[in-house]
Amino acid sequence: GDRLSLIDDETKEPLPAAVLPFLGKTLLQGLIEDVQAREYLYFKLRGRKIITNIAIMTSHEKQNHRRILELFERAGWFGRPKESFFFFSQPLVPVINTEGKWCFEENERLFLKPGGHGVLWKLAQQQGVFDWFQKKGVQKALVRQVNNPVAGCDYGLLALAGIGLSRNKTFGSAACPRLVGSQEGTSVVRERIRKGGFSYSLAPIEYCVFKEHGVIDESEEEGGVYSKYPSNTNILFVDLPAIRRAINKSPIPGMLVNPKRAVYFDGDGQKREGRIARLECTMQNISEQMESTFSGRLEGSSLTEMSSFLTYNQRRKTISCTKRKYGGDGLFLETPEGAFLDVLNNAYELLTRCNCKVPKPRSPKLFFERGPSFLFFYLSALGPLFSIIAQKLKGGKLLWGSELDLHIADVELENVTIKGSVLLHAEDENKGAAQLSNAMFVNEGIDFRAPNLYWKKEIQYKERFEIILEGAGFFVAEDVHFRGGGRIIVPDGMRLIAQEKRGELFFIKEKRDPFSGNWHYTFTDHAKIELSKLTKS
């Protein structure tokens, strides 16, 4: 969290990036919710609950490892079994200056920094992560970094895992368009002539060594902003036995030295500022050891026969990192503000697909001067596929400056109009349900004059209407007009029906059928997921 300037309010100590508040929760909680969304999807399709085993690599820099464990403890392990997590920590490596001399901190200790995520594989082997997965029967895994909150959007992770599993691949990476001149690496196919044939592998190349590898970073189209080389993200699919074999050939892949300016102390205790560097390594480069050998040369579509693969998706659905604090310079790349703008654009695409009338997102400049044209937040388990959400949300309007916040998975909204702000919150995401049809909410909504931090979801309201579902609460409203702010709480196990007669609201409370809900999920003959209404509601 260095570049994010994350500081503990009480101790004034630096905090890890995983605790950055984004969309009203930490980045770590957002990642866990993405995992739970896929588990919920599996449950709805197969009728069986599963728990995904998660290994987390931390760092001892600035007590990050301890703080991550404390976060899990405070969060009650996010409602998951403690034994479904495995923590291991990457080592710190010494820093040198351009003269090759050691750099020190003010206390005369060596200046140490994490040595890069390429140590992931060797550490996983040494600290028992692979053995832990093997005992649990896990052969394949997805890898992602906590500072990329859009990675779980729509179908990206499911497609990556689906291709890897269905075609028994050993390595895969999620690629997307890459801005010319950006500090992002790329991946190319490396061909080697072997005795009796040709071998192929994916070769990631970091941006700082493009010239050494003959990579000319130019736009795909004349005058375009995107490079002809895609971005090689840290969203990976891996075959664990294949990774273990690859470690024997390259235990620390992608080693490089990338100098950066910083303040340090020399061996005589003198404070200096200059270019310093550490030996880094990159986890994607393990793919260079995943070679596929063929008797003839591969070209075009035949390259899909390789054991490694890339998926290619929209950038705003693949990578939008929260690496640094926004400096007010209009450069949003790798900032929380930039990631939030991508989240809004994804939300606009989603709501448009739902045939919901919604204002277009404002330009970044207008957004930060005047606020958003709309806000839409939702729980990952609502989908996560846009094609699923579009079957739950149908039609309706989200008027200018309005907000809809859906912290719920089992919901049906049909022709719902919102002028103001509405929160629909299920305290138990797996049990709470709601069904609204031809409903209208009108209230004062967001206070746009307040110092709102939208990307943190720190928003002040003039009025807001909230529907809170306790446990297995079920809320139903049809042909109802909700005027002004307010809060409705539906008790656990109850079904609350809102009705309107002659302009007056009244409510009917009854016991909820424990088997009731909104949706039944099935696969169609064309491998699409189709939702049908349950008979009991």
Predicted features, each with a name:
Residues 1-284:
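Domain-scale recognition of functional cores that engage charged ligands
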Residues 160-537:
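Left-handed beta-helix
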